[in-house]
Swiss-Prot record:
Name of the encoding gene: C19orf44
Entry keyword set: Phosphoprotein
Biased composition, class Polar residues, residue ranges: 143-169, 234-243, 301-312, 462-484, 499-513
Biased composition (Low complexity): 437-451
Ranges of compositional bias, category Basic and acidic residues: 190-206, 485-495
The keyword Phosphoprotein is annotated on this UniProt entry: yes
Phosphoserine PTM sites in chain numbering: S114, S213
InterPro entries with a match to the protein in the record: C19orf44-like, DUF4614
Region (Disordered): 142-216, 228-248, 291-312, 335-354, 399-522
Record has Phosphoprotein as a keyword: yes
Designated name of the protein: Uncharacterized protein C19orf44
Amino acid sequence: MASARKASRPMRDVFGDFSDVSLEDSTMEEIRNFQISRNLTKIAPGHSRFLKRNQTLDEKHLLLKENPVLGSGPRLASCRPPTTASRIRANAALMKLAQLETRIMNRKLQRNLSDTESDSMTADAGLPKRADRILSGGALELASQNTDKTSQNQARELPVTENNAQNAKVSRFLKKKQAPVENISPEAPAGKERTLQTPKQKEPARTFDSPDSDEEEMKVLLGSLMDSSREKNTNQGFSSANVSEEEERKLFSVPSQLRAFTVPSVELSSAKPSQTSHLPTSLAADRTLHSTRSRADYPQSHVSSDTASHTPSVSITGAFSNSVSLKMGHVKLVSSPGRSEAETVDEPVSEGADDSLDEFRINILSLDGLAPAVSENSDLEQEEESAQRQKTAGKIFRAEASTGQDAPRQAQARSWASQGKAASAEGDESEVSEHLSASSASAIQQDSTSSMQPPSEAPMVNTVSSAYSEDFENSPSLTASEPTAHSKESLDRTLDALSESSSSVKTDLPQTAESRKKSGRHVTRVLVKDTAVQTPDPAFTYEWTKVASMAAMGPALGGAYVDPTPIANHVISADAIEALTAYSPAVLALHDVLKQQLSLTQQFIQASRHLHASLLRSLDADSFHYHTLEEAKEYIRCHRPAPLTMEDALEEVNKEL
């Protein structure tokens, strides 16, 4: 009854559940996804037609579903006997893939509604026949492997009875009473044919009896799918190859390589449908994942340009394309598709199509996918040739470096030139190498121009450069006007010119050495004296005696200027000579200056004390006295003028007249 109520819900409520999925609770999200898959299987729109056939367990049931709401083409669902638990886990992984595709198609519903209605009419003619042939081989193989009895409870489908009284013409879903069966996708054994169908198609959802045990099944599925996929890949002979990020960008940027991935798979699926149907279920699931990844990663503009396929092109949303382009640099080719499938199954479906589809990996199943390896080999050969050139150039420069003193700098410049050449050949060096190549190119041009000058000018240039820039390095300002990068041809010509002018450089070296010797002699002849040397000590030196505190003659006076046996000794005594010669005007002047300084200091101290005392007095005494009313009246009474009488007024008038 609960399933019947879910089946009666309208289509918009079913797709509304996708937006209501919570990102925090992964367990409730998986249960809800299983319920959505049941609703997608059991809801019958008004435009759907179902063929009901009552057959035995070994017979196949073909369900042709046309969903105009989603804009998908005919849908195929085969009812087969219960299989082993490993097949059920593989089908669960495929069901998760179908749910991811359903989310993508739901996002693109409003934009591509008009295109998908016209494309679904064209796809009705050729698809059912091919799917019928695919189902014939896959059902027989799966029926032969029915050995596990416990899988019957896991794969049992709930019988559904669709009762719609309002519309009697609406078909009903099949009600299986004979034995429990499960819906297995016909597209699982034929993962290659998914490239022919529209990208909007989704696989029919599978239904299970116990959705609460999905976590346990997923944990077991992670181990079983990885082991089975590794064995199948070993038998099929797939080889793994780690490709760099640069090669993957080249691979996805070329449109012809895009066709090389899609067209051979179409031819294989159309020419040999029975052979693809006998592939194991795990391998088919892997190919289904690869086809989904290829449709998600490759630009859809190339698919829409092919008019013969009649498949509608789906332009991926902006966020999805941006995430794919940002993460393409980190995608590497892996040899185990089962690992990518297990990682995709383990993720919650509600995280969005961009994050879940980015976990898929790409396997190169055609020889065209290995095309970038040829260009890689050519790049490696070019790098080896450039390395050989560097080694030979280094040997030549070492031979030239031993001939003179200027050669080490030239060898360093040439080694920088070889580094710049390697950087231009590879094309992906850092900015430091570009700077070195620019500076080395300017140095090489300077050397080549100096060597190509006439013999009379070349020695002079070398002399100036060696004399001035002996202790200096090449200035970076000289390379500002030079180009930052040079082509291979220009560098080759420069190296050839340097090798030709090596003889002229060798002849210039002796002249350079002679010029250095001349300049060195000229520098040694120049005598530079210090200012202290030009200022001699005074003739009379006096020493202050600590005891007498007076000036006394020093030993320099008697030893340098006085005769050992002066005549004055016989006439004048030593005390008189000392008194006469002890007079020093400098000492008197210094004494006077010190007295003046002392007097100034005393005056300053007195002035500061006076200021301090006046400040204290001003603070102690009241500078303003507040008068009372009585004092004001007394002051007015005392200073009031006498009243003017008549007599006094007449006297004043008479005086004025």
